[in-house]
């Protein structure tokens, strides 16, 4: 998530100059206007409203991003998430980042409200999908972490976890579709499996 004010503070604290948050916002707008990046807004799933800031930005062309960085910083998890985002846009979805609040009781017996992120809330007409990008789910703990925000939506829209592994698509005991990235990208009906 990107917050121009935090970026400005980072530039200042790292001795990289005094750049205002308004300047950073302008540059982000220039990048969006030139179609180099696009913005996903934050959406409160239970409250059914948009949260004004911070936004999440994705590169429209991963190759240009990689070339600009001289093919360094190859964070596969972020690149995979970016590819999924771009594919959803190509398929005609409006794509937001979902926020789900859930009250939990901690070890002290106190109830605390926690926020969980859903990577993508995808809407097209009357269709809605919740999608998590999970580079891998090597164990039950990671699987529970990835599906937690999906479960806390407490609704009946389709829930999907996309993993990098080349797997046969399957539904877990909670009805969540687990699908490999390759099948997700190559099968036009991959969201309907």
Task: Kindly give the residue locations of the regions a language model identified.
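Short acidic, hydrophobic short linear motifs in intrinsically disordered regions
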Residues: 1-11
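A cross-kingdom feature that marks ATP-driven nucleic-acid transaction machinery
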Residues: 22-193
């Amino acid at each position: 998530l990107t917050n121009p004010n935090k970026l400005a503070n980072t530039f200042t604290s790292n001795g990289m100059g005094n750049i205002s948050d308004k300047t950073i916002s302008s540059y982000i707008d220039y990048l969006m206007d030139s179609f180099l990046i696009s913005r996903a807004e934050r959406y409160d799933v239970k409250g059914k409203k948009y949260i004004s800031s911070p936004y999440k930005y994705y590169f429209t062309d991963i190759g240009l991003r990689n070339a600009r960085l001289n093919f360094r910083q190859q964070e596969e998890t972020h690149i995979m998430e970016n590819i999924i985002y771009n594919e959803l846009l190509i398929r005609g979805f409006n794509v937001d980042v979902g926020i789900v609040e859930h009250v939990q009781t901690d070890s002290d017996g106190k109830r605390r409200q926690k926020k969980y992120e859903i990577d993508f809330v995808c809407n097209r007409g009357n269709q809605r999908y919740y999608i998590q990008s999970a580079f891998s789910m090597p164990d039950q703990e990671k699987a529970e972490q990835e599906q937690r925000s999906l479960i806390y939506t407490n609704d009946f829209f389709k829930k999907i976890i996309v993993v990098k592994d080349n797997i046969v698509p399957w539904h877990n005991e909670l009805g969540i579709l687990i699908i490999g990235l390759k099948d997700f990208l190559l099968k036009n009906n991959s969201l309907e499996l």
